Amino acid sequence: MTRPVVLEQSRAIPVAPEEAFARTLPMPLPTLFRQWYGPIPPIRAIRDQTGEWERAGQSRTIVLKGGGTMRETLTSVDAPKSFGYTITGITGPMAPLIDHVEGAWIFTPQGTGTRVTWRWTLHRKSALTAPALPVFARLWRGYARQSLESLSDHLVG
């Protein structure tokens, strides 16, 4: 079995942790992830979600521009500190590389605001895909930086 790869990106945002958490968890993903970053596509739509995104155990299908999909399941909600999820059933360009992802958003008090950290623990398909992961990791960090900037604009604006 191959070891997972942990990717993480953070940004300080000048809002209280409670507000950052409360407004990030239910935020529509196509609003947050609306831009391409190199070959990483934006989110086009969400399907199969029932009600507000707020409870562990809820699932939804993420549809990417370009045709890929993935299934997201909310695994933990610890307001206002963090929420976690898994991504499975990946189709499209990431499918040959990634088996599943354990994701987390973490909200830590920092000064008068919040340090928001987005973490992905990647479980690759096989050891054969390992050489491609450093390239994907570099791209993901850029995508995460861009997404955290978008989140900051949403929370502050």
Give, region by region, the residue ranges found by the protein language model.
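Hydrophobic/aromatic beta-strand elements that line small-molecule binding cavities or substrate pockets
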Residues: 9-11, 70-76, 101-109
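Short acidic/polar mixed-charge low-complexity motifs
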Residues: 3, 66-68, 112
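Beta-strand/loop substructures that line and gate deep hydrophobic ligand-binding cavities in soluble
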Residues: 87-142
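Glycine-rich portal/gate segments that line the openings of hydrophobic small-molecule binding cavities
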Residues: 31-32, 42-96, 146-157
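Hydrophobic ligand-binding cavity/cleft-lining segments
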Residues: 1-52
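Hydrophobic pocket/interface hotspot
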Residues: 20-24, 60, 74, 85, ...
